[in-house]
């Protein structure tokens, strides 16, 4: 039995969205996230670790992925999962498009597919489908260089629900974006 | 080499605070957390898993514990750790005193020792001491039955920095308490 149905959808750019995770994906995530120039090395490492944990632990990891493949090569991805001890709240941990493919609408497409997947009920750690997602949270930094990121989330319908002062470092707050799904 | 210096301090109740984790502690945590009547079974399971992860992974787990032992039997504990990708922010994951020993000031004592430990610089995943904690976060529910918990955090100097509506479930918000250490 396949552990998760593969989500496949074509995109005007020619890319294909898939929900399965492949052994070559950790390296692809390192390339995609690194290409954006937005993240510290230790943050790139965290992004890669989530894919590795999904590969090693399967659904028990509770990390779910969507990859956008162009000519069988990943050029963007989203990573999300249910928040433990909540009923229907999800974290969107990562969403990134390779620098060479930004501005094509692929980020919006990945976000829409991720939300559709969460609403449809992803498999839980035991393989049984979870109830539909009610709310999605995204955390990001208040540093001005993230302004394009904020605008992307806002275009996708997310609003700032909380700000934690000096969370990442002195002068670097955490912004918590949220969106109710329905 | 011991992986973490044991913190030992006596308390008027006769209990001793220790920072080492023992193989019998998962069962002790189940007893302590279960005795409070505050938590769902799946939440008790999460509390126990954190101790198990510390025992199996050691410092790499990034979970730190303080136990209050009375006659060598744990009657309360705190669990905390550095928040990945932050400089000096910590989560206090759990703090609980066995129902039979509440009202003795042991919760306050555990909180003060936990803050002192975070300020002193706990060992990181590589064993080297982390910089002192700047900020501590505690998450809890908005459900009225948690009112004694809110009052405890407030007496310890924590204030509500954010509220995430319907986070745990419809009508059950997440409150994020924070305190700046110095």
Cite the ranges covered by each PLM segment.
Chain A
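Conserved beta-strand-loop-alpha-helix junction that forms the acyl-donor binding cleft
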Residues: 102, 127-149, 167-172
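A short, glycine- and basic residue-enriched loop/turn
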Residues: 87-89, 150, 161, 167, ...
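Conserved N-terminal entry element of GNAT/NAT acetyltransferase domains
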Residues: 1-24, 179-182
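Short hydrophobic/aromatic beta-strand or adjacent loop that forms the aromatic wall/cage
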Residues: 63, 172-176
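Conserved active-site tyrosine of GNAT-family acetyltransferases
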Residues: 153, 158
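Intrinsically disordered, low-complexity terminal tails and inter-domain linkers enriched
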Residues: 4-10, 120-132
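Acetyl-CoA-dependent GNAT
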Residues: 19-102, 108-113, 117-124, 163, ...
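Short aromatic/hydrophobic contact patches that present stacked aromatics
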Residues: 94-96, 137-139, 176
């Amino acid at each position: 039995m396949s552990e998760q149905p593969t989500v496949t959808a074509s995109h005007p750019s020619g890319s294909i969205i898939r929900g399965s995770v492949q052994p070559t994906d950790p390296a692809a995530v390192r390339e995609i996230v690194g290409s954006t120039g937005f993240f510290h090395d230790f943050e790139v490492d965290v992004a890669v670790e989530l894919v590795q944990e999904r590969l090693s632990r399967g659904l028990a990891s509770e990390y779910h992925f969507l990859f956008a493949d162009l000519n069988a090569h990943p050029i963007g991805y989203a990573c999300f999962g249910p928040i433990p001890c909540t009923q229907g709240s999800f974290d969107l941990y990562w969403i990134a498009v390779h620098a060479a493919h930004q501005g094509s609408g692929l980020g919006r497409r990945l976000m829409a597919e991720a939300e559709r997947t969460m609403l449809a009920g992803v498999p839980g750690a035991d393989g049984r489908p979870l109830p539909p997602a009610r709310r999605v949270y995204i955390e990001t930094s208040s540093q001005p260089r993230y302004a394009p990121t904020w605008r992307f989330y806002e275009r996708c319908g997310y609003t700032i629900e909380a700000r934690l002062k000096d969370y990442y470092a002195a002068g670097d707050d955490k912004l918590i974006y949220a969106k109710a799904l329905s």
